[in-house]
Amino acid sequence: MSETFDVDVLVHATHRASPFHDKAKTLVERFLAGPGLVYLLWPVALGYLRVVTHPTLLGAPLAPEVAVENIEQFTSRPHVRQVGEANGFWPVYRRVADPVKPRGNLVPDAHLVALMRHHGIATIWSHDRDFRKFEGIRIRDPFSG
């Protein structure tokens, strides 16, 4: 089964004050351990860097080099594929976005779903309920229940 994760999972795994920290950290450790195929979407990696280094979003932002090292834990694993837009992405995005008509904060979610479809990724781990607006993907909430 091919799977990926949203920015929130990485942020909660890093942010020790988060009520979801333990669950997120356990999930990230499972992804890092392998051997199952995991996809790191470039917008997720960059979104993580944006959030965890921002001086006002978290109580104690990470130094940029620490945040980059966290991402490199994924990029150094042979079972983790790093993917982004490729030729033919725009028509895939349109097929994902047109039925939902995303605006505002839903646009990045449509972007991730289009990347998933473009690369054949079936499942995304996220607490973001907006992913339910898109058909054809499986959403796993690591923090429910």
Curated annotation (Swiss-Prot):
Q: Which InterPro entries match?
A: Mtu_PIN (IPR006226), PIN-like_dom_sf (IPR029060), PIN_dom (IPR002716), VapC_family (IPR022907)
Q: Which UniProt keywords apply?
A: Hydrolase, Magnesium, Metal-binding, Nuclease, Toxin-antitoxin system
The cofactors named for this UniProt entry are: Mg(2+)
Q: Which residues form the PINc domain?
A: 15-141
Please give the biological process terms from Gene Ontology that the record holds: negative regulation of growth
Keyword Membrane: yes or no? no
Presence of the UniProt keyword Cytoplasm in the record? no
Q: Which Gene3D superfamilies match?
A: 5'-nuclease (3.40.50.1010)
On the tree of life, the source organism's domain of life is Bacteria
Coiled coil ranges: none
**Annotated residues for binding of Mg(2+):** 6, 109
| One annotated GO molecular function | magnesium ion binding
Q: What is its EC number?
A: 3.1.-.-
Q: What SUPFAM superfamilies does the record tag this protein with?
A: PIN domain-like
Biological role stated in the UniProt entry? Toxic component of a type II toxin-antitoxin (TA) system. An RNase. Its cognate antitoxin is VapB48.
Q: Which HAMAP family does the annotation name? A: VapC_Nob1
Question: Family assignment?
Answer: Belongs to the PINc/VapC protein family.
Under which name does UniProt file this protein? Ribonuclease VapC48
Name the encoding gene, please: vapC48
